[in-house]
Amino acid sequence: MKDSYNRRIDYLRISITDKCNLKCVYCMPSKGLKYFKEAEILTDEEIVRFIRIARNHGLRKVRITGGEPLMRKNIISLVSSIKETGIRDLSLTTNGITLSKIAGDLKAAGLDRVNISLDTLEAARYKTITKGGDINLVRESIKEAERAGLTPVKINVVPIRGINEDEILAFASLTFKENYHIRFIEFMPATRNGIWRKKRCVNSEEVLEKISTLGKLESFEFRGRGPSRNYRLKGAAGIIGIISPLSDHFCGFCNRLRLTADGKIRPCLFSREEIDIKTPMRNNATDEDIDKLFQHSIKVKPRRHLLNENTASTRIIKTMSKIGG
């Protein structure tokens, strides 16, 4: 289905929990987070019902997010149920802390691949950024994801000035030997009262300039309409992706909606607009009723975000862990 600006919307990102087993400095509020009660979260049946309805309008791609999605107790059966709806491309974003234990089970259930969030290669720094995480668990998860066939493994890196921007070259260098997709994502305002400051953002052109010191960067495009500009260093096995929501927004070909953990469709990540589907579902709404809400959410999708405008309408009103990253 196309929106008001002729963009084909065929991708849904679903947050299945707001809980997380890490407390990353750029994601969690400085004062902590009050989690949703279990009854406030969409059930498996509600999630699958919504996907089946959206499939009628050309939905083909689903990404499961959180919080940390692997904290959901029945994640394996949920993955299986989503895949059974006929979704062609099913992926999941995780911090990798517990992935190694169930990577094979996730693949068998129908998961196609994973993105693993990792902002440093140094154990001590990882513990600081995540407030206690063990990087060795993530390293093992990357290996297990490869063994299970959840490939290509994509590693999401958020360069933050004064925290980890000195590791950009180390991450990029991983692609010489490994078939990883290393994706550098500009630091965005992800929570209220967090560490986000515009001066901390390392813009994508600076990232590319640093990486180019390692060798010639060749443009490498994939089929699809994702936000990543992709490159390969000459002679490298893997890919480098650049995602620039601030310095070079990709709104003109955005193809996605988000479904929050508490059952609200979010047409744009950085908008106050939300369409509640949970309440109607729990009040005997028909599939036709939910279908109309889905179509409405596409029609009200804005032309672009206004992050750089610093207006009241774009100030963060939920943490990224509740919206789904």
Regions found by a protein language model. Name each.
Residues 1-11, 177, 187-325:
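Auxiliary Fe-S-binding modules of radical SAM enzymes
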Residues 4-44:
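Canonical Radical SAM [4Fe-4S] cluster-binding loop centered on the CxxxCxxC motif
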Residues 16, 64, 263:
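Conserved, mostly hydrophobic/aromatic
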Residues 18-20, 28-31, 118-120, 186, ...:
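Short, small-residue-rich loop/turn micro-motifs
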Residues 41-64, 68-185:
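Radical SAM/AdoMet-radical enzyme domain recognition
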Residues 32-37, 122-129, 191-195, 276-278:
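A short acidic, helix-capping loop that chelates divalent metal ions and anchors anionic groups
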Residues 23, 27, 124, 129, ...:
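Residues that scaffold the ATP/ADP-binding catalytic core of kinase and kinase-like folds
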Residues 22, 123-124, 249, 275:
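Glycine-centered loop/turn positions within well-structured domains
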